[in-house]
């Protein structure tokens, strides 16, 4: 794990076409935050500000060629049962994380949801052994 400073404006470039940020754009409903992030996209972005699992793509044509941008929110690994301080006891949050495969130019982002302490990724079940 590498610390990226200057919260909330720090950036970590995974490659030439994908950056990780904290993020600041929020949509009230599921899917709206990634759509807002794609509005002025010039690079694909992974962000976590909204604590939801969301993913969207946008194709922009330039010089007769498609350029595809992606915005991804990977959810949260925080508790979502109201114990985490916030403005409400119940939010539209989802637990999850992401796995990114990449080279210098291309990437693949997989979102992995965590449901009641369990995830399935590439056919294998992962289960929390933590305490309540």
Predicted regions and their residues:
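A short, compositionally biased
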Residues: 6-9, 94-95, 113-116
